[in-house]
A protein has these predicted regions:
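Residues forming the flavin
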Residues: 1-50, 56-265
Length: 265
């Protein structure tokens, strides 16, 4: 696939115009093109008349020809979709993996594990969203703080009560997969294209719930109000974690505890 960047058009322009300009910029005949699509879209309002700025994805019928067209176009680059496959290890797990924390990292880790048949156990120190929202509202109204159910802790993590902007500066190609998963669980479909994707807090709560439901549907288990309290190591390897006064045997654990769980640190 080729990405053609910096396709600038008036606000009134439609996607087909962006595709045509991208092919013209790339100097590739339409007859060689298998598919065109919008990879990213933003608005540049910095200088005078605002412009739409597209990044257009172009797939040729003969992928082997793509490098030659890219070489003569400074605004073009080759792009391959990141592999979002969870690769199995060489040794079978005796016990289910444990994911500690149900914020963004824990949600996606548990979702991938569940989709691949690992039946993860998720430990979340806070409550499910409905109870968490009630606790936050109570705090706002009365000042009564539940240390495990608040803006920081609970299903969805701290970002659940932000304004829903999805911001990253890492440029990781896996970001596209993350946006697609969010859209598949109820986020606006256009976040996969927008340069500044925005879900919105009201929608984000529903997205988080739907992701949790898929985890459970695929054999995962979510234990709310169950903080990680300890780990057990034998012969240099993890053998169990402690939570809710019991040992949970496991060989693998994902510590997705965020930055505010000081007692866990």
């Amino acid at each position: 696939m080729i990405l053609v960047r910096n396709i600038r058009l008036p606000l009134s322009a439609a996607e087909p115009q962006a595709f045509e300009k991208a092919l013209h910029t790339l100097r590739v005949p339409r007859s060689k093109v298998e598919h065109t699509g919008v990879a990213k879209l933003s608005v540049d309002a910095r200088h005078g008349q605002p412009k739409l700025v597209y990044t257009v994805a172009v797939t040729l019928k003969q992928p082997g020809e793509e490098a030659a067209f890219v070489a003569r176009c400074p605004d073009a680059a080759l792009h391959s979709r990141a592999d979002f496959t969870l690769h199995a290890g060489t040794q079978p797990l005796v016990h289910r993996p444990v994911v500690c924390g149900l914020g963004p990292a824990g949600l996606f880790a548990a979702l991938l594990l569940a989709r691949n048949g690992y039946h993860p156990i998720v430990l979340e120190r806070g409550p499910a969203l409905a109870d968490r929202v009630a606790a936050v509202q109570k705090f706002e109204q009365t000042g009564a703080l539940d240390p495990n159910a608040n803006i920081q802790f609970g299903e969805g993590g701290a970002g659940t009560f932000s304004d829903g902007k999805l911001t990253t500066r890492i440029g990781d190609p896996l970001c596209d997969n993350v946006l697609e998963i969010l859209a598949a669980h109820g986020a606006p479909a256009d976040i996969v294209k927008k340069a500044k994707p925005h879900v919105g807090t009201d929608i984000l709560k529903d997205v988080v719930r739907e992701m949790r439901r898929e985890i459970i549907k695929n054999g995962g288990e979510v234990r709310f109000r169950t903080p990680l309290t300890g780990v057990s190591v034998k012969n240099g390897a993890l053998c169990a974690v402690q939570a809710d006064g019991q040992d949970i045997a496991c060989e693998r654990a994902v510590l997705a505890i965020g930055h505010s769980a000081r007692d866990t640190f």
